[in-house]
Every structure is written in C-alpha cells, then in structure tokens.
C-alpha cells in the first residue's frame, strides 16, 4: 500500500506553558514548518503555536 501524504504533527505553544495540539498536515503542499495562532487555555490568550515532532 502507498504511504499517505499526511503526517501527524504536534503544535506546541510558544508561551512556554507546555500546552500542545495535535493535527495533520499535507507534506507535499506544505514542506516548511507550520506556525499558527491558537488559543492557549493555560495563559487564556491566543498565542503562536509552532510545529514540533511527535515523539
């Protein structure tokens, strides 16, 4: 079977709280690292989340 085009990634908060989201991304359309603003419930604000590897 062919390997899927989507990889599982972890989006980790840049606020230093340790909070993270998991999602998938298409590695062909977006080969660079993803950075997106999302809500961090620990600091109760919208902060930037950056892509890290799932261990």
Curated annotation (Swiss-Prot):
Keywords attached to this entry: Ribonucleoprotein, Ribosomal protein
GO cellular component: cytosolic large ribosomal subunit
SUPFAM superfamilies per UniProt: Zn-binding ribosomal proteins
Entry annotated with the keyword Ribonucleoprotein: yes
GO molecular function, one term: structural constituent of ribosome
Coiled coil: none
GO biological process, one term: translation
Superkingdom of source: Bacteria
PANTHER family, alphabetized: 54S RIBOSOMAL PROTEIN L39, MITOCHONDRIAL, LARGE RIBOSOMAL SUBUNIT PROTEIN BL33M
NCBIfam families tied to this protein: PRK00595.1, rpmG_bact
Family to which this protein belongs: Belongs to the bacterial ribosomal protein bL33 family.
The protein, known as: Large ribosomal subunit protein bL33
């Amino acid at each position: 079977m062919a390997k899927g085009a989507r990889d599982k990634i972890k989006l980790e908060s840049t606020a230093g709280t340790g909070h993270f989201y998991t999602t998938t991304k298409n590695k062909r359309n977006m080969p660079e690292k993803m950075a997106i603003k999302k809500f961090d419930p620990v600091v109760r604000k919208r902060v930037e989340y950056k892509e890290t590897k799932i261990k």
